Every structure is written in C-alpha cells, then in structure tokens.
Amino acid sequence: MLDKETYYLKKMKMLMLHTFNMVLKTEEVALKETDLADVLSVAEMHTLVAVGRHEAKTMGTIAGELLINVSTLSIAINKLEKKGFVRRIRMEDDRRVVRIELTDKGRDALAQHEEFYYNLVEEVSSQMDDDEKKLFIQSLENMARFFEEKLDIQS
C-alpha cells in the first residue's frame, strides 16, 4: 500500500501527463476542423501566438518566448512567410535588425486560435463553481511560476 505522499505524487504525475496530452490532442483536432487544417501545424500556430497580434517583434524575442534558438525559429518563420502568415520588416535606422509581424491572414489565424482557447476554457470552467475556479487559477499560477523558475524565465 502506498503512503499518502507517494499516492499524491503518482496521481499528479499521471494527471499532468494525461492533461497535457489531451490539451494538445484537442488543439490538433480543433485545428483540423478549420480552414487552416491543410495549411498550419499546431507548432506553426504557436509561433503565430508568439509573434503576437500587436507590435512587430525581433527574432530573438520570439525565440525566447518559444524557448527555441533563433536558427530553429528562422526555419519556422521562412515557412510562415511563404504561406503568407507573417512578414519580415527591416528597420530603417539599422537594416541588420529584422522584426516579424503578422499579416492580415496571420491575424485571422490567431483570432481563430484565441477563440478556440476561449471556448475551451469556458467549457472547462462551466463545470466548476467559483471556489473551484479560484483554486484552479491558483494551481495554474503555481505551476506556471514553478516552470518559469525552473527554466529561469522572466514572466
């Protein structure tokens, strides 16, 4: 028989892995149900999220948000640029600096992705009372803080 702490750890491990995989699978399925299914992968969609809706960002900033190196990001940005989702902007004052921004097509794709997550969170939280929602938020904040500290990330 397991002691209480071992039971909790095993249960949390199983639930974290299962939940992470189910969120990714749900995202894949939802993407396949859109007009973007044949055009964008989930990883490319996450890159669009990191590029963001508003002001253009440098490759270094985007790579930092995705926790990947700039050369890996370059490959993804090249593909997204060819597909018409992002554009590169060279700065007039320093032509070496390149910023990335979403095109209208990229903003439309991002809007679909944001709507998917809004609906997902709305569905999940509809099963919770206010106390459960507060506890869920607190738990997610604690997890986010743990991983940010573990990876030495400033939020």
Protein language model features and the residues they cover:
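A specific heptad-register position in long alpha-helical coiled-coils used by two-component signaling proteins
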Residues: 21-24, 78, 107, 141, ...
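N-terminal helix-turn-helix DNA-binding core of bacterial DNA-binding proteins
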Residues: 27-69
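Charged, amphipathic alpha-helical coiled-coil/dimerization segments
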Residues: 78-135
